[in-house]
Amino acid sequence: MPLSRREIRARATRFAKDFAHAHNEEADAKPFWLKFFEVFGVQARSVGSYEVHVKKLDNALGKIDFFWPRTLLVEHKSKGKDLNKAAIQAVDYLHGVKENEKPRFILVSDFARFVLYNLEEQTQTELTLDAHEIRPDGSDP
């Protein structure tokens, strides 16, 4: 059963509060993404994998932080890091992804900021995570 907008907003509020002080990629990224997907009723491990090894364009090995085949490639950085560099790194990983598994979206984040790239439409959407801007009753701020 799909979640209501109200339930998604309530979950998003809890998520934002729970991760308001997260900052370290190594320590906090996996639980962050597990809970992020739960906001939308998605069990991350049922749709994708963490730390997927791929061969980059320069033949060096890279590690995709989270990969949902045909849907999403996630690259995560510690809070305050350059998300443009993260996006370039994510695009470099595409070289090592099988053609029939290439994702529609790339999502980069540093806990506080998200940038979603739609590779098919060649658009990007930016969002800042702020628990104070999300209303648990489902209404818009």
What does each model-identified segment do?
Residues 1-141:
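Nucleic acid-processing catalytic cores of prokaryotic defense/repair systems
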